[in-house]
Amino acid sequence: MLGSLLAVALAGAAVVGMTGWQIAAQKDATLVAPSQVAGLRLDESENGKSTADYLQTALSAEVDLDQAVGAAYLDAGGHNVLFFGGTALIWTPKNDLDSAFNLISDDQGAVTDLHDVPAGRLGGTMRCGKTATDDGDMTVCGWADHGSLALGMFPRRTEADSAELLRQIRAGAQTRG
């Protein structure tokens, strides 16, 4: 009996220790919108800036963030990518990410078919889904860890391409202190 209690206590301590380690390793993140990242360049047009500001503000209203960032990017073909996110101590990354996906909901519907995809070397959780637009379905992907959360909207891109592009954007935009 005592051996069983000791085993349960040790298992519980291991879980708490592992979670504590993840929080400590991820909590001091910074997030920026680089002028160029992953083959994309910052869209500095008035429309690009206002769209990025709107999404940044909407995300900050949905998720409690200490610092937020938003950017509209263009690829060489003129196709855009919208990126917005922020940093804070995030206790429940997956739940907060799901809340952030809710902000994409509009009169045409919500983000559907959400599922996990590999988060890459920075870890945390990453999910992708799609949302309906006037031009057809658009891929939406996002990540969250204990220090940051971000979403990307990828018109005219496949889910696989969008997920890889978000991992590349994250590698250029996120650092940990």
Which residue stretches match the model-derived regions?
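Short extracytoplasmic
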Residues: 36-66
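A short, surface-exposed interaction/processing loop segment used at functional sites
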Residues: 109, 156-158, 177
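Hydrophobic single-pass membrane-targeting/anchoring helices
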Residues: 1-27
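A short, solvent-exposed beta-edge/loop patch
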Residues: 124-170
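Sec-exported extracytoplasmic/periplasmic mature domains
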Residues: 106, 170-175
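Short Gly/Thr-rich strand-loop-strand
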Residues: 98-136
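N-terminal hydrophobic targeting segments that direct proteins to the cell envelope
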Residues: 18-47
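A short acidic-to-branched-hydrophobic micro-motif
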Residues: 70-95
